[in-house]
Amino acid sequence: MPRRKQQAPRRSAAYVPAEELKAAETEEDNLEDDGLSLDVQDSEYLYNDEHEIKETQSYQNSPISSATNPDAGYGSPFSEASDHLADFKSTSSKEGQDKEDGQSTENASYPTDSLAQIKAVYTNLLSECCWSNLALDLKKSNEKASPTTNTDKSSKSEASGPTSDPGTPTTITSSSCTNTSTSICVTTSNSAISNTASGYDWHQAALAKTLQQTSYGLLPEPSLFSTVQLYRQSNKLYGSVFTGASKFRCKDCSAAYDTLVELTVHMNETGHYRDDNRDREAERTKRWSKPRKRSLMEMEGKEDAQKVLKCMYCGHSFESLQDLSVHMIKTKHYQKVPLKEPVPAITKLVPSTKKRALQDIALPDSPEQAGISPGASVSESAKDPKAANPYVTPNNRYGYQNGASYTWQFEARKAQILKCMECGSSHDTLQQLTAHMMVTGHFLKVTNSASKKGKQLVMDAVLEEKIQSIPLPPTTHARLPATYIKKPPDSPTGSTHSEEKKDPEKEKVNIGEVEKKIKEENEDPEKIEPATLYQYLREEDLDDSPKGGLDILKSLENTVSSAISKAQNGAPSWGGYPSIHAAYQLPGTIKALQPSVQSVQIQPSYASSVKTMSSDHNALIHSPGSLTPPPHKSNVSAMEELVEKVTGKINVKKEEKVLEKEKVISAKPPSPMAKENKEILKPEEANSKTLKKHNEAEIQKPKKETPIESHALNGTEPLKAKVTNGCTSLGIITDHSPEQSFINPLSALQSIMNTHLGKVSKPVSPSLDPLAMLYKISNSMLDKPIYPTTPMKQVESIDRYYYEDSDQPIDLTKSKNKPLVTSITDPVSSPLRESALMDISDMVKNLTGRLTPKSSTPSTVSEKSDADGSSFEEALDELSPVHKRKGRQSNWNPQHLLILQAQFASSLRETAEGKYIMSDLGPQERVHISKFTGLSMTTISHWLANVKYQLRRTGGTKFLKNLDTGHPVFFCNDCASQFRTASTYIGHLETHLGFSLKDLSKLSLNQIQEQQNVTKVITNKALSSVGLIEEDSGSTFQCKLCNRTFASKHAVKLHLSKTHGKSPEDHVIYVTELEKQ
């Protein structure tokens, strides 16, 4: 219906002269037909709008929600009038009650009275625009109906008001009663206007509370104002409305108006009355208006406020706490907070006028709507308000779905709501979903699984039906999603943690049978399907598991699972290896090789990237469906779990890459390999156990360990040794070259070792260096057949020095020359086995030749090894502990550091109390240093600032300790001498430098170099006391890079390696031999 132009409202009868009243009566007679013709349409729009109000206004306890019937057909105009009376009849005003009584008696005594009398009564009673349709309805029925029906109608309409909701205290006075619908019904002297359902009048609502406190007679224009919601309007916006405000401003466009009427007309014409909370985020930023209370967005910033003032259920953000509270009360979302998602998102974005139809579509199967026909009669709807409004549920009379319907809705959608977003498993309760997330670590993987891995986790329909969550009771066995094979229905039965809790005594296995099964599977991977008929664990599965090792897993199952998930997902919160996750973020490459030693029962969806490999190779790696996965997984996963906890997977990666490379290089027939391996396994296990006992004995001899330490070593050592064997033999058995090799194992291993082996933080206790022990064991296991005749003496020397001060990663090359004692009694069983192991050992040698970490095995000069040019590394440990350079390798020229340290020491000022005060170096000294050393002034300033910061923060730095205590100790970086006073320290540094600091600005570089060659002899004599002078004692050696001189070739090589990072092959280039004088 087209919107009519709004005109000034009519005033109440108290202010209308008699002649105007008569003129209005005649005009209304002329417009009577128009008013009646609009009744049906008016009622339609009113009902639509009343439904919207029920959605947006729950703070008002209005009876409208239980008395109206928007769905039961529109019936007669009289039902509308009855509803209006029920909604807006006032019971709080004594004056209004008196008038109601008067009206009832008048209607009874003058049923056939003239229109003027009825008009006067209604004008005096209501004086509100919204009653005009009612008056016209009654007048029409008055003309056409009998006196009895008229009396019935009027009395019924009057009676419906006071009795509609006696228990609801209405806060509306008769003077301020108006239509609760969002349409504005303003009756003027010549028209009856009903706006279309475009929204309620904000500005009439703006004065509701003020009107409730104002007497009827004082209101100049009572018909302007609605009692509908002004919960969001601010009095500051308009000034104080009734204290002389001269302008009324539109909150959207800031247009100013002299009267509220004009502003109301403007608002209705332009549509500037819409609800802020339904605006889009982009539009909300254009708002200039402030909420009634002080805005949190002004105080905290918009982002912080939106994070705080946000509905946890639907995600709406609000400008003030009051807005959020109103929203919560209206929508009852505070009852639904624990679970997100159920509300259809479409209802948040559509206009309010269309929302009702969309809600009809959104929940067509709602139990509340069952059996309700649109054509229900008025009496039925009045008797059953719940049936009349399908959105009014027992717990909520204002329109949103909750209570019983919410319970039904949640039950219907529980499979989608309580669903793991990573693996797709559904759960019955939130607690089960939480337990599943914690056990599997999927809460970490959800955000970065698909995007970071570059692979989408494809879930087959059959697989989704088979997925079952990990239940809360720890004794039950659950299936895990077999996402790592190409044939989901043939997924193996993954064992959970509860399997690992079984008594290890039950898990005895015949190794020959195991290897036979692996061999059969290797030859014909397609024979595995019948074995998948059992979806749960059986006693046979437990019996087939290998013996030993699971008692350790009992204590580690929780920490290991979290460590694995964090290492795979790049979120390491555990200490020691802060950057370990970077190695596993190489895009989709390194992970492709992991499943050969993968722990399936802990990370079910971990192998989603295995899709890159061929199905044959996949089947071989995982052995799907046969009875051999339990032994394979128990052996290898036990190894992986411990290694991941201790070393962050560095070693497992190394061994995997070695095995994969060996497969690619030498693709030998699988059957003979498997047969030979049967002979290999038992001796190797015996050797590993012997090694374990031997190592533990050696640990306890030189070191006094606490029981906890020895327990840790006793626990982890045998498992590592044993399963390292399993890993090696597995690689030989499944000697099957993959069809597709997407990554060069050599480059992958190099990148990992380059990134991490140099960065692994040093162990706190040298006797508890699991990384070094694992390297030792794995390498000796690989190489033991190659050196079968090594004498016993070398093994003793290994064990004697192995657990001494090992503060750096072990030198992999050294262990190859010193095999185990038991290798003497274990001759090479066949050329095939020897060649396979030699391939592996050569691979390891090639990989570790350039990436050798620094040795942690001190030895004497007579015993040092020359393998792979590692002599310069060993000599570092031959020095006394004070000669070792700790911390990061410095790129500073040592001479420059000596100059800077000497200058800084000279700048210290001693106070009367004996303490030292730091004073800045003057610009002159900085210029001298800069000219001599070539360092920039900025670099010098940064070095000085860093030293001062360290001294202020900790009281010491590398060359100066205890400055804050008044008893400083100065350290010489060259010879580790200690000095108590700054002056002696400076004099000592000047002997190293070969010149005095005072002469720094006068000397040229050539003079200094010549003087250095002479004065460095004094320093070399100090070094000779350590016993490092080689046989060519008649000469000194000078470093060409920094012109420092050394007493021996070994010392200058050590200097080049430590200070300049030069390799031993390049030492000849940078060393100049000088004759001693």
From Swiss-Prot:
It comes from the Eukaryota. CDD domains: homeodomain (cd00086). InterPro entries: HD, Teashirt_fam, Znf_C2H2_sf, Znf_C2H2_type. One of its GO terms (cellular component) is nucleus. GO terms for biological process: regulation of transcription by RNA polymerase II. A zinc finger (C2H2-type) spans 248-272, 309-333, 418-442, 970-992, 1037-1060. Residues 1-110, 142-179, 274-300, 362-394, 473-530, 849-873 are annotated as: Disordered. SUPFAM superfamilies: beta-beta-alpha zinc fingers. Residues 274-286, 497-529 have a biased composition (Basic and acidic residues). GO terms for molecular function: DNA binding; DNA-binding transcription factor activity, RNA polymerase II-specific; zinc ion binding. Residues 885-955 bind DNA. Keywords: Developmental protein, DNA-binding, Homeobox, Metal-binding, Nucleus, Repeat, Repressor, Transcription, Transcription regulation, Zinc, Zinc-finger. Residues 26-36 have a biased composition (Acidic residues). Residues 160-179 have a biased composition (Low complexity). Residues 56-69, 853-862 have a biased composition (Polar residues). It is found in: Nucleus. Belongs to the teashirt C2H2-type zinc-finger protein family. PANTHER family: TEASHIRT HOMOLOG 1, TEASHIRT-RELATED. Probable transcriptional regulator involved in developmental processes. May act as a transcriptional repressor (Potential). Involved in two major neuronal regionalization processes: primary anteroposterior (AP) axis patterning of the CNS and segmentation of the cranial neuronal crest (CNS) development. This is Teashirt homolog 1-B. It comes from Xenopus laevis (African clawed frog). The gene is tshz1-b.
